[in-house]
């Protein structure tokens, strides 16, 4: 057996990207007496993905964003109901602390004139901050000052264990082949995800770290959720972030409409499937058409000198070959399956796994691959978050005891495994094995848009690659490292397809064409993997939902919860259990894209609603010319009278169930703060809800959120009192000087009932009895929540139109 150096440290950090550097630095800040060693196959500070990507950090304004509301949004819109709610809440809650930590470590983040961060809104809850690509160098410098030790150009091949406890690792130098056996009391795995070496930006994600842990006995979880793909320009392979919103086929048809009802947070597997369908049905190629919409150039917003040369060179090179905007999907991968708890402890004692090693394995984000994971800017912050959490747990441990003895047989086997391809006189290059796996994984119809037949085809290639592994030959220790990576890439692909074949449903990003629906009865569970006697074994695990604030029952049924007391009522039996009336599906065509804002009604023109006929935009949503936003919906309400409508808004805020039966999938409660007024029979029905406030919990399309609705007399928000005197309908409206939203439900009689014309205006308040724009000049109100609210409004009022006449008949007499 080859000779080796014996080394010791309290904490061994495997991987010198942003996650590993964060963990090492934080441990030394919390407990300076802990001896920390970082081992990196490249150079720590230049390794990982944080210094070669877009350089963006996710940002949450915690003065505006309730972490639980974001968790609800993420659970439904991104995570396929599998989001670990308490862990995600912790991530969001720590966002400000993480930014301050990076700032304190010397990472330069752009500031606005007022001293706050310069941000770009990216969704209803999130924004992003751009940073320069020297982030990892800055953190390494801080770690060095604190006394963290580094071993660069050193590959770890195997973990050492005693029973179920990690005791250290075996490593070798890629420069001269010198072996090191490192005893450690704690080990933090921060070696990244598996990216199958398809896309150059992510090619350093080789999966060898977590596969080594897997072979040592660590369990994995959610290996099927590691198949992210991104649209790229077909010649340069440059990413086109958010390009899925602008997809057109060869016939000039806007095919985004085929899979997306409203603009989503990021690309989904449905976009990949649409590309595949268009090309297999003769409608390809697919190209992008941005129309007149300006494209954001982050380099124009912030000067990032360190990464600027790279970005300019990359863009200039791409421009020489990208003669048009034809796109195709490119597999990114991002398998990140180390099974960990909420302190990022793996199933082997003494082992932590952070960042892209354990993103899916932690359950944090649910059924979605590692960052970008349909959540732009979360990659770096996820690594920082996991690094901080694991580091604080590790720093609090007792390091006073002796090191555990290392197993000589394990050391011998580890060195022999590295040396085996070096000893061969003849053989194949590891690239030959990797290429076979790329043929199995890179075609998105096999790895992303999955079907049993295509999974079987891909598995044949995986098995072929598996048989090639013993024939690999290495000329030097660089190639010996590559042989380890080839073994890992084969195992990663096998894990992906075994678990994908096992999961008979579609969920979140995960898509099975032969099982297109989410199956919460059979598959509300994780798939775990164990390595037993040299073979992969899969089993299922129930999700631990006891401390989730959105309950499992609520997630599975898709209905808001009801109490046992509510279940005894006639209102529950007759209206909650009743299937909701579905709106005309043609109405949802108006939810896909914004309308022309110059033709939409402005809040300053409230009184035009009294005019006969219809306006240019009676249904749809739009950006108004001054930056505000609006939505309009029109609902036919046969058999409904203005008296019924007024009754409903005075009556439903008195009991939670009354709001639930309006929309049992999205309405949790509406509670009036003015019960005495609502019950005062000396007042007219309108007066019983005018100048009252309802506290509302509701899912308006982006997850559960809390809303305050201040109902007003229409004359107090700008409607003409003279016109109101002659109006035969009713107007239910809200708005005040505190809220940047004005709501108006304008109900007018028509033959056979009434017609409801709804308007919402965003970026405006009621000040001095009239609408006033409060949105800063030059700022546009984001359209994603407006778009989502339109879809919700269409849904809820279709059902109210169906149930209101009978509810009024049964309940109004006792209320009046």
Map each language-model feature to its residues:
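Core beta-strand elements of the Rossmann-like FAD/NAD(P) dinucleotide-binding domain
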Residues: 6-9, 176-186, 346-348
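N-terminal Rossmann-like FAD-binding beta1-loop-alpha1 element of flavoenzymes
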Residues: 11-38
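Conserved N-terminal glycine-rich FAD pyrophosphate-binding loop of Rossmann-like flavoproteins
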Residues: 42-68, 200, 227-231, 238, ...
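Mobile, glycine/GP-rich and aromatic-enriched active-site lid/loop segments adjacent to catalytic centers
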Residues: 96, 103-157, 224-374, 442-561
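Glycine-rich loop(s) and the adjacent beta-strand/alpha-helix scaffold that form part
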Residues: 186-238, 362-393
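Long, amphipathic alpha-helical stalk/connector segments used for oligomerization, subunit docking
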Residues: 397-478
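Terminal "cap-and-tail" regions of soluble proteins that handle hydrophobic small molecules
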Residues: 560-626, 749-816
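Hydrophobic ligand-binding cavity/cleft-lining segments
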Residues: 589-680
């Amino acid at each position: 057996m080859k000779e080796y150096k014996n080394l010791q440290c309290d904490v061994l950090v495997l991987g010198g990207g942003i996650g590993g550097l964060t963990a090492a630095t934080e441990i030394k800040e919390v407990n300076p007496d802990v001896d920390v060693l970082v081992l990196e196959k490249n150079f720590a500070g230049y390794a990982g993905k944080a210094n070669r990507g877009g350089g963006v950090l996710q940002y949450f304004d915690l003065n505006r964003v309730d972490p639980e509301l974001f968790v609800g949004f993420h659970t439904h819109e991104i995570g396929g109901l599998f989001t670990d709610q308490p862990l995600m809440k912790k991530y969001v809650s720590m966002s400000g602390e993480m930014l301050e930590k990076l700032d304190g470590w010397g990472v330069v983040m752009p500031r606005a004139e007022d001293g706050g961060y310069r941000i770009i809104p990216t969704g209803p809850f999130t924004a992003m901050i751009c940073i320069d690509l020297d982030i990892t160098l800055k953190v390494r410098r801080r770690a060095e000052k604190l006394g963290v030790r580094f071993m660069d150009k050193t590959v770890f091949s195997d973990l050492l264990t005693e029973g179920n406890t990690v005791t250290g690792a075996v490593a070798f130098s890629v420069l001269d082949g010198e072996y090191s056996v490192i005893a450690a009391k704690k080990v933090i795995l921060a070696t990244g995800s598996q990216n199958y070496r398809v896309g150059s930006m992510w090619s350093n994600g080789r999966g060898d770290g977590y596969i080594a842990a897997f072979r040592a006995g660590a369990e994995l979880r959610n290996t099927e959720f590691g198949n992210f793909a991104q649209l790229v320009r077909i010649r340069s392979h440059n990413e086109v972030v958010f390009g899925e919103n602008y997809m057109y086929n060869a016939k000039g048809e806007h095919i985004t409409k085929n899979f997306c009802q409203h603009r989503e947070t990021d690309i989904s597997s449905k976009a990949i499937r649409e590309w595949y369908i268009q090309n297999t049905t003769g409608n390809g190629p697919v190209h992008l058409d941005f129309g007149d919409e300006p494209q954001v150039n982050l380099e124009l917003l912030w000067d990032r000198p360190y990464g600027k040369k790279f970005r300019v060179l990359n863009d200039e090179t791409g421009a020489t070959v990208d003669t048009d905007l034809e796109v195709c999907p490119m597999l990114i991968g991002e398998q990140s399956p180390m099974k960990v708890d909420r302190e990022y402890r793996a199933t082997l004692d003494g082992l932590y796994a952070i960042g892209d090693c354990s993103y899916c394995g932690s359950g944090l984000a649910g059924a979605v691959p590692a960052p970008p994971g349909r959540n732009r800017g979360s990659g770096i912050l996820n690594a920082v978050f996991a690094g901080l959490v694991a580091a604080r747990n590790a720093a609090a441990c007792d390091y006073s005891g002796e090191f555990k003895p290392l197993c000589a047989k394990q050391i011998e086997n580890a060195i022999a495994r590295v040396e085996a391809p070096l000893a061969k006189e003849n053989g194949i290059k590891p690239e030959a094995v990797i290429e076979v796996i790329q043929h199995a994984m890179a075609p998105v119809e096999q790895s992303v848009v999955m079907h049993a037949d295509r999974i079987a085809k891909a598995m044949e290639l995986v098995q072929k690659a598996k048989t090639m592994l013993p024939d690999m030959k290495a000329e030097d220790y660089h190639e010996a490292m590559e042989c380890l990576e080839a073994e890992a890439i084969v195992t990663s692909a096998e894990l992906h397809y075994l678990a994908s074949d096992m999961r008979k449903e579609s969920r979140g990003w995960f898509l099975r064409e032969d099982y297109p629906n989410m199956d919460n009865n059979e598959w509300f569970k994780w798939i775990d993997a164990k390595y037993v006697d040299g073979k992969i074994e899969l089993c299922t695990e129930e999700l631990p939902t006891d401390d989730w604030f959105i309950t499992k029952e609520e997630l599975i049924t898709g209905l808001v919860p009801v109490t046992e007391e509510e279940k005894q009522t006639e209102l529950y039996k007759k209206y909650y259990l009743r299937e909701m009336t579905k709106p005309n599906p043609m109405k949802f065509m108006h939810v896909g894209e914004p309308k022309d804002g110059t033709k939409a009604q402005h809040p300053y023109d409230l009184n035009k609603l009294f005019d006969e006929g219809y306006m240019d935009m009676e249904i749809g949503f739009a950006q108004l010319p001054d930056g505000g936003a609006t939505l309009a919906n029109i609902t036919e309400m046969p058999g409904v009278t203005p008296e019924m409508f007024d009754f409903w808004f005075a009556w439903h805020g008195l009991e939670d169930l009354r709001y639930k039966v309006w929309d049992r999938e999205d309405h949790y409660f509406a509670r009036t703060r003015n019960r005495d007024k609502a019950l005062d029979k000396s007042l007219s029905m309108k007066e019983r809800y005018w100048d009252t406030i309802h506290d509302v919990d509701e899912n308006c399309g982006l997850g559960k959120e809390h809303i305050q609705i201040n109902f007003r007399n229409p004359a107090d928000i700008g409607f003409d009192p003279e016109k109101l005197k002659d109006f035969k309908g009713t107007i239910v409206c809200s708005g005040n000087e505190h809220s940047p939203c004005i709501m108006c439900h304008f109900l007018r009689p028509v033959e056979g009932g009434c017609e409801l014309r709804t308007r919402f205006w965003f970026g405006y308040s009621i000040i001095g009895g009239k609408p006033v724009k409060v949105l800063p000049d030059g700022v546009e109100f984001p359209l994603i929540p407006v778009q989502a609210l339109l879809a919700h409004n269409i849904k809820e009022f279709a059902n109210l139109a169906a149930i209101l006449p009978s509810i009024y008949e049964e309940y109004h007499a006792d209320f009046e």
